[in-house]
Amino acid sequence: MNRLGAERRPFLFVIDYKQEQVIVEEPDQIDSEALLYNLDGVTNVATASRMNDRENRTSAIRWETFPITQSAYADSFHKVVGHIRAGNSYLVNLTCATPVRTDLSLKDVFVSSEARYKLWMKDRFVVFSPEIFVK
């Protein structure tokens, strides 16, 4: 990343939260069969394939979520507030795992999402967000 940045060459990086798995690739080296991204319009997804995948669906989407309890969220929220008040942080993104049951594939979720920032990695995960985390 340092070398590419110093050379002012664009790159995509993906790092898991445990910092155990890292991907750093230049856009022209990314295999779109294995990884798709759309970062506020900077994308390797062809417009025609996006629309065709979405329009080919004939049945309703099955989508069921299993969020944490309000009490569990409140506990996490109060912990974050305590750290902010203690001066340990001034910016926090409080998130929690929410299991989802659906008949969509991970790629279907990517294609269906209208988020400004999204990424799909074949057979691994999909992620999407309305906001950028690193700029």
Q: For each predicted feature, which ranges?
A:
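Extended alpha-helical targeting/anchoring segments
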Residues: 1-135
